[in-house]
Design a protein with these regions (language model features):
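Extracytoplasmic beta-strand/coil segments of soluble accessory domains associated
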Residues: 82-124
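Flexible loop and strand-edge segments within Gram-negative outer membrane beta-barrel domains
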Residues: 256-260, 273-320, 326-352, 384, ...
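Transmembrane beta-barrel wall of Gram-negative outer-membrane proteins
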Residues: 191-217, 229-286, 300-312, 363-367, ...
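Outer-membrane beta-barrel translocator/receptor signature
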Residues: 139-143, 153-236, 258-261
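Short acidic/polar hinge/loop motifs at secondary-structure boundaries
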Residues: 121-150
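Short, acidic, small-residue-rich periplasmic hinge/interaction motif at the N-terminus
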Residues: 39-74, 82, 110
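Outer-membrane beta-barrel signature, preferentially recognizing the C-terminal barrel domain
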Residues: 294-313, 348, 396-398, 446-468, ...
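Gram-negative outer-membrane beta-barrel transporters
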Residues: 369, 413-414, 425, 528-540, ...
Length: 646
């Protein structure tokens, strides 16, 4: 049982690789109460929004898309991005506690689910491992977008699961009429969690200024039983206590705490038909890893953004926009020493620079869209603090150059969209790295990756159509081909990974991964009763996964040896949602269900697949009060890979 209480004062209106997964039946109940105070009332409580990844409004996006904003976002706001969107259709979350919950979309995670902040890469290392947190604070986000299909191709070619874009208002595009602000506070009973966030916006002449901050502190969360479940490696360790073979903690889960804070500042010069803005963000996040090995991660990031947009720059075009971001990310991984407590073990650094040019054209023969270019340069480094040697994978520089083009059209009751993206990706490892000896049992040791540069040419495209066969009723069909290059970790890993209890081995011979996704949906978008049903079939060529060889690494506390491999695979699934008066004044309800099944074409189940689930949400909004409750039931996952433990 989990209860969340929110208090808000709105002063003005605001527009793995190699993870062994143990699955079980899960039931979650959430209750929240909110009081909302507005400086001025509005006859329409629902803000009109538009996805930045689409030219059309929310109800007309062809592929299943969700945009969280306003009160709905505030009520679902969690400690992490995964916790915030974890009950949306087709979206679950990784299981590394309060601090490192990353979205899992339709059975896919890691590099197959791209995370953006204001349309540019977050610049963290969360795609490498599920214990690495997403470095994009959500407390002061204006909206969170979940995109698929052609809209997703605008930002990346490898998002076969989907794309999540966290949008904030640090770079304002219009001058505030007056100084405005907002404060949000919450309390969680399950972790004695206390959170607060605030934002202030004002203008001086033609300059708009934005300041936001947030703090979130959560203790180890309460559990209804014991910390040990069936499965291997059952030792739980916490600082200050000696290692034991099977310490069975009750009442609270060790190393499940989370403490984070962030500060963001932005300024914009607003002209008659353009704006130019900059912003800076500092983020700190210290969180425990609730695995049997224990440990914690101290994470920080400095991020700098620049945007310039000119409206109606020349005939036939509605806007030209240039965006850039620099992120300097690092985190320190701490292992548990029985004598000294948390001891620094590894330091991860990632420096990322990204540039985008986006040119949007006006409607032509029913079509409206944009095209542009994107350039990304990143440098990843992981080092063992005690020895100065590499940790898990050698230092690697990744270069990506892309061209994209998306179009959306409307002709009466028919709509269509098209997307095309070409990406050239290169992975360049440190070629003088000396790999460690895992001491595999039984011998021989797994082959070490070749430290050679790899280049990949990727072509992704999408087409979809929607027929509005009656007022408020529509049915759509879309087809997306998405190609992604293997990540640096999948190519070059060769080392110990404490949190997943594995010795990870990359495969430098991996080819590009290609997904072919066919999707059908039917939806009702008007009236008090609304709903949607989505069904999809996603077939993969060269699906990359971590295979457990059955060996153990003597140099890594007898952790399991996991090697990157490729195979043909298929993921199929369905999602359904039915709502009554949802996000409106009065009483409302939302009923949802989703399920996916992943298999190797040669036989056997894909690893790391989420369990089927059903959920119910109830809400009542009256005057300035809002109360809601949600209940989610996850079934037992019995379709496991041969090496997974249930």
């Amino acid at each position: 049982f989990f209860m969340k209480m929110n208090s808000r004062s709105l002063l003005a209106k605001r527009n793995a690789f190699g993870l062994l997964k143990s699955v079980s039946l899960t039931t979650t109940l959430t209750v929240s109460f909110s009081v909302i105070a507005y400086a001025q009332s509005s006859s329409n409580p629902n803000l009109q929004i538009e996805a930045t990844g689409s030219q059309e409004s929310n109800t007309s996006i062809l592929t299943p898309t969700k945009i969280l904003q306003g009160n709905e976002l505030l009520d679902k706001l969690g400690t992490t991005l995964g916790a915030t969107i974890g009950i949306e259709l087709g979206v679950s979350q990784t299981g590394y506690g309060l601090g490192a919950s990353r979205p899992v979309m339709r059975g896919l995670d890691g590099p197959r689910v791209q995370i953006l902040q204001n349309g540019l890469s977050v610049g963290d290392v969360s795609a490498i491992s599920a214990d690495h947190a997403v470095a994009s604070p959500v407390a002061n986000a204006r909206q969170i977008e979940i995109l698929r299909g052609a809209a997703a191709l605008k930002y990346g070619s490898g998002s076969s699961g989907g794309l999540v874009n966290v949008v904030n208002d640090r770079i304002l595009t219009n001058l505030p009429e007056s100084a405005t602000g907002a404060v949000n506070t919450s309390y969680d009973t399950v972790s004695n969690g206390r959170a607060a966030s605030g934002v202030i916006e004002a203008s001086v002449g033609s300059v708009a200024v934005h300041v936001d901050t947030a703090i979130n502190n959560n203790q180890n969360y309460r559990i209804p039983g014991n910390s040990i479940q069936d499965g291997p490696n059952q030792t739980w360790n916490i600082p200050g206590e000696p290692f034991t073979e099977a310490t069975n903690y009750t009442g609270k889960l060790p190393n499940s705490f989370n403490n984070q804070n962030n500060l963001g500042v932005g300024a914009s010069y607003i002209g008659k038909s353009s704006y130019t803005g900059v912003s800076v963000e500092r983020m700190n996040n210290n969180y425990g890893i609730p695995t049997v090995e224990g440990g914690m991660i101290a994470q920080s990031q400095n991020r700098y953004d620049f945007q310039h947009q000119t409206r109606d720059p020349f005939a036939g075009f509605s806007s030209i926009k240039f965006s850039a971001a620099n992120s300097n990310y690092n985190h320190t991984e701490f292992a548990i020493n029985p004598d000294t407590g948390y001891t620094p073990a590894a330091l991860w650094k990632n420096i990322s620079n990204e540039f985008r040019l986006d040119l949007a054209h006006k409607q032509f023969m029913g079509w409206k869209g944009s095209f542009g270019a994107q350039v990304t340069r990143s440098s990843l480094e992981a080092t063992e603090i005690a020895t100065g040697n590499y940790a898990i994978l050698p230092s690697t520089k990744t270069n990506s150059n892309a061209l994209f083009w998306i179009e959306e059209g409307r002709w009466g009751a028919l709509q269509g969209n098209l997307g095309l993206r070409y990406n050239a990706v290169s992975q360049n490892p440190n070629q003088v790295t000396e790999f460690q000896n895992p001491g595999a049992e039984p011998q021989p040791n797994p082959a070490t990756p070749n430290l050679e540069n790899r280049n990949f040419n990727l072509l992704s495209y999408s087409a979809g159509g929607l027929w509005n066969f009656s007022n408020g009723y529509g049915t759509g069909l879309s087809y997306t081909v998405s190609q992604r290059a293997p990540s640096a970790a999948e190519l070059y890993s060769y080392g110990i990974h404490e949190s997943t209890a594995t010795f990870s081995v990359g495969n430098s011979n991996l080819n590009k991964e290609t997904s072919h996704n066919l999707e059908f949906n039917i939806q009702k978008t008007v009236g008090k009763v609304r709903g949607k049903v989505n069904a999809y079939l996603n077939k993969f060529n060269n699906y990359i996964y971590g295979f457990y060889t059955g060996q153990t690494a003597e140099a890594a506390e007898e952790f399991s040896v996991v090697v990157a491999q490729q195979a043909a695979a298929t993921i199929k699934g369905a999602e359904a949602e039915l709502t009554y008066n949802w996000n409106q004044f009065g009483s409302g309800a939302r009923l949802f269900a989703d399920a996916s099944q992943g298999t190797f074409d040669a036989g056997g189940n894909l690893p790391l697949q989420p369990a089927p689930r059903v959920g119910l949400q109830l809400a009542h909004q009256q005057n300035k009060w809002l109360a809601n409750a949600s209940y989610t039931y996850s079934f037992e996952q019995n379709r496991l890979a041969s090496w997974e433990v249930g």
